[in-house]
From Swiss-Prot:
Gene: thiM
Protein name: Hydroxyethylthiazole kinase
UniProt pathway: Cofactor biosynthesis; thiamine diphosphate biosynthesis; 4-methyl-5-(2-phosphoethyl)-thiazole from 5-(2-hydroxyethyl)-4-methylthiazole: step 1/1
UniProt-listed HAMAP family: Thz_kinase (MF_00228)
InterPro entries: Hyethyz_kinase, Ribokinase-like
Annotated PANTHER family: HYDROXYMETHYLPYRIMIDINE_PHOSPHOMETHYLPYRIMIDINE KINASE THI20-RELATED, PHOSPHOMETHYLPYRIMIDINE KINASE
Catalytic activity: 5-(2-hydroxyethyl)-4-methylthiazole + ATP = 4-methyl-5-(2-phosphooxyethyl)-thiazole + ADP + H(+)
SUPFAM superfamilies associated with the record: Ribokinase-like
Single biological process term from Gene Ontology: thiamine biosynthetic process
Binding site for ATP: R121, T167
Domain of life: Bacteria
A Gene Ontology term for the protein's cellular component: cytosol
Entry keywords, A to Z: ATP-binding, Kinase, Magnesium, Metal-binding, Nucleotide-binding, Thiamine biosynthesis, Transferase
Molecular function via GO: ATP binding; hydroxyethylthiazole kinase activity; hydroxymethylpyrimidine kinase activity; magnesium ion binding; phosphomethylpyrimidine kinase activity
Organism: Bacillus licheniformis (strain ATCC 14580 / DSM 13 / JCM 2505 / CCUG 7422 / NBRC 12200 / NCIMB 9375 / NCTC 10341 / NRRL NRS-1264 / Gibson 46)
Amino acid sequence: MNMEDAARGIELVRKQKPLVHNMTNNVVTNFTANGLLALGASPVMAYAREEAADMAKIAGALVLNIGTLSRESVEAMIIAGKSANEHGVPVIFDPVGAGATPFRTESAQAIMRKVKVSAVRGNAAEIANTLGEDWLIKGVDAGEESGDRTELAKKAAKLWDTAVIITGAEDVITDGTKTYTVGNGHQLLTKVTGTGCLFTSVIGAFCAVEKDVCRAAVSAAAFYGTAAELAAAKTESRGPGSFQIEFLNQLAAVEAMDIKERGRIREVE
């Protein structure tokens, strides 16, 4: 995948303005909606099980996020996911905090069993625990890493037959056959709640306009990381509050040329 391909994703999103159905958590709903609007997508936040299936079938992508889960919300997500599957809508799953509690882990695993997911995005601990492997987790954040993230991503992608995105200082993205790392981003992303969840929804927007899910995820990661770098360059001395606002500005401002110039994408074996 070359830089030209990676840069094309944001142009397609802005041209097509895909509807992204987010069943996300109540900590990040506003930030996620604003982020998607900034980059050019059309977000909808619909959680009720009574309309979950109907909304999912008309969306360009469905994003499931268990950050503030309940039994009822998981049931609604599964209903929406099955509807998306029936209508050819890509499903992006964020198993937030999988491994932190048995209920959270079991819920993540239930969604993976009952819904055909196109891509899973999480930190190494979340992916490992959803897979059924032990990996240290602290709250909903990854603990000290003790394994090979690339091999973990490949294993998960092959077992689930889906694209896997493991985020960190360097993102690992694989469909089990092709594997990439994306080195764009900034540590200030870790100081603003919801940036990981928004990234999952951004992947959803890119998957809505690009059928190759792995390609879409790489393109989304390069775009998202570039926006973070440019926002940090303008606000780093002022802290995370200023960064958060400027990051939304950069999601709207980053162009394909910025990604071509700054993108750090590498294919690995």
